[in-house]
């Protein structure tokens, strides 16, 4: 049936795809009311700078200080980061009907046992607060070690979201491991191909990121895998439109806003019935095959390493923010803005500008901070505040 004039693209998308809010800003989640929400260190760092969330930050630090029992500040901050992620997750679960994704420290991405222990610990925090593990996805990078950690956690009833996924070999390994959900990064795949080809743009239907998600979706539906596909990291509306029908799409507030205003007929582009009839060869992906395929896929190997580095930098920035706030709570420093310290974390070449490549974290936060839209963040723009810029993006 053709849509009525009142049906926006977002309303139509919601009939065929689960929309997920890619934000840690509780106000944005209240506005868009998605079924699920995802968070990561970049988003939490942004949200933690907003005055309205100061009580969550301070509460996490006080809780960590009590738990640490006189330990040094580094240990307190480490505990507070986990607590803060869970506290934001709990607030989000009070709004959404479905699930929230909470990320394991990206610096553990090649340590299977450490990721298993961290996943268990995060779930313990959620359950101690009265939340069901069925509503939480533990987000882990799609390294071979991360996939093995997720396999262990899934067997314990701890559901996982495998992120930083760029290649079919990663997707197949995740499905074989019984992972609940994967997050292929559409926009970052596009970024790599644009840089390699020198092209400024691709038609949405030929966007390399879109084609990658379609291939994964078709493979999963062809062979009956239960793992859900959640497209992530979008650069433009065209990518979202071309993936209508995907199991889930995690969308930043600015694109949710555009979708809620746009009208016209939205065609379903991905359909399980159509995928099941396609001629697709089954691929075996054991560890040797995974590592060989990953080495051959320069895009996937480049972007996975870059993504882990980016999320790790975001954690360093969050650690600096919490360390400074802990000093304030102890009366050892005045409340101030940590912009200069954050800037040093990301300005790798010390030229006074943060490029998208140097940032490496969540695109929606980068775009929000890039107030003049020139593709670079100056110290003045960062000094405007992660939180303030984040609200500009979600308004």
Question: Positions of the model-derived regions?
Answer:
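Hydrophobic faces of well-ordered beta-strands that scaffold small-molecule active sites
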Residues: 17-22, 35-39, 79, 98-104, ...
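Active-site beta->alpha loop and helix N-cap motifs at the rims of alpha/beta catalytic domains
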Residues: 43-45, 50-144
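Primarily EF-hand calcium-binding motifs
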Residues: 336-349, 361-373
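Catalytic alpha/beta core domains of metabolic enzymes, predominantly
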Residues: 161, 166-281
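Conserved, mostly hydrophobic/aromatic
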Residues: 40, 102, 138, 153, ...
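N- or domain-start disorder-to-order transition segments that initiate the globular core
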Residues: 1-23
């Amino acid at each position: 049936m053709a849509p009525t004039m009142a049906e926006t693209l977002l309303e139509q998308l919601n009939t065929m795809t689960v929309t997920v809010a890619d934000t840690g800003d509780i106000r944005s989640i209240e506005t868009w009311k998605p079924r699920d929400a995802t968070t990561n260190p970049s988003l939490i760092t942004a949200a933690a700078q907003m005055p309205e969330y100061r009580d969550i930050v301070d509460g996490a630090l006080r809780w960590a200080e009590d738990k640490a029992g006189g330990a040094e500040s580094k240990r307190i901050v480490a505990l507070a980061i986990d607590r803060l992620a869970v506290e934001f997750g709990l607030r989000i679960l009070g709004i959404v009907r479905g699930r929230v994704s909470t990320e394991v420290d990206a610096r553990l991405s090649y340590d299977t046992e450490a990721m298993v222990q961290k996943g268990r610990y995060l779930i313990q925090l959620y359950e101690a607060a009265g939340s069901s593990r069925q509503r939480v996805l533990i987000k882990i990078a799609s390294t071979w070690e991360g996939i093995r950690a997720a396999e262990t956690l899934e067997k314990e009833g701890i559901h996982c979201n495998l992120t930083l996924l760029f290649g079919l070999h990663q997707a197949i390994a995740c499905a074989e491991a019984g992972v609940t959900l994967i997050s292929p990064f559409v926009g970052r795949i596009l970024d790599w191909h644009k840089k390699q080809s020198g092209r400024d743009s691709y038609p949405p239907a030929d966007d390399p990121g879109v084609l990658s998600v379609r291939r994964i979706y078709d493979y999963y539906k062809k062979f009956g895998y239960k793992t859900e596909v959640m497209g992530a990291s979008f650069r433009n509306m065209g990518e979202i439109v071309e993936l209508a029908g995907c199991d889930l799409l995690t969308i930043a507030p600015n694109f949710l806003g555009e979708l809620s205003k746009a009208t016209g007929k939205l065609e379903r582009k991905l359909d399980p019935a159509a995928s099941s009839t396609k001629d697709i060869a089954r691929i075996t992906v054991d560890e040797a095959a995974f590592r060989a395929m990953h080495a051959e896929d320069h895009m996937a190997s480049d972007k996975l390493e870059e993504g882990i580095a980016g999320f790790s930098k975001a954690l360093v920035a969050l650690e600096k923010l919490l360390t400074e706030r802990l000093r304030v709570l102890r009366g050892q420093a005045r409340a101030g803005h940590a912009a200069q310290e954050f800037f040093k974390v990301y300005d790798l070449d010390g030229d006074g500008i943060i490029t998208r490549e140097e940032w490496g974290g969540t695109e929606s936060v980068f775009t929000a901070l890039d107030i003049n839209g020139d593709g670079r963040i100056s110290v003045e723009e960062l000094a405007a505040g992660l939180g303030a810029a984040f609200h500009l993006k979600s308004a």
